């Protein structure tokens, strides 16, 4: 019984790690990392800071996906985030969901 539980736990951990890596790869693929890093402000805010700012917002993933696709200005300073028209709706949602998991 203990072995089965440990196996399930290990499989779950690998699944979560794979999900996190897949969306980090998605951020690289869509060139998000040119302006954003997980821990550090570059041109745009650190992704962990974005996650913290919107952690309690009910529709945070939808809101962030819209910002990823449509861009924004004045939210995090003077440098605007350009729209990312080549990012699919599904990828924008996956990126937003991933960002919100960062602590």
From Swiss-Prot:
Gene Ontology terms for molecular function: electron transfer activity; heme binding; iron ion binding
Any one Pfam family match given in the protein's UniProt record, by short name: Cytochrom_C
Gene Ontology CC terms, in alphabetical order: periplasmic space
UniProt protein name: Cytochrome c-552
Binding site for heme c: 32, 35-36, 81
Entry PTM: Binds 1 heme c group covalently per subunit.
Keyword entries, A-Z: Electron transport, Heme, Iron, Metal-binding, Periplasm, Signal, Transport
N-terminal signal peptide: 1-22
Keyword Signal set for record: yes
Main subcellular location of this protein, as a coarse class: periplasm
Underlying gene: cyt
Subunit structure: Monomer.
Record function comment: Monoheme c-type cytochrome. Probable electron donor to membrane cytochrome oxidase and to periplasmic nitrite reductase.
Record bears the keyword Membrane: no
């Amino acid at each position: 019984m203990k072995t089965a539980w440990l196996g399930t736990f290990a499989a779950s951990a690998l699944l979560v790690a794979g999900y996190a890596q897949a969306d980090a790869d998605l951020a690289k693929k869509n060139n998000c990392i040119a302006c954003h890093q997980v821990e550090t402000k570059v041109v745009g805010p650190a992704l962990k800071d974005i996650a913290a700012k919107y952690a309690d917002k009910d529709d945070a993933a939808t809101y962030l996906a819209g910002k990823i696709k449509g861009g924004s200005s004045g939210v995090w300073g003077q440098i605007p985030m350009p729209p990312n028209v080549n990012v699919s709706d599904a990828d924008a949602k996956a990126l937003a969901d991933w960002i919100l998991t960062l602590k």
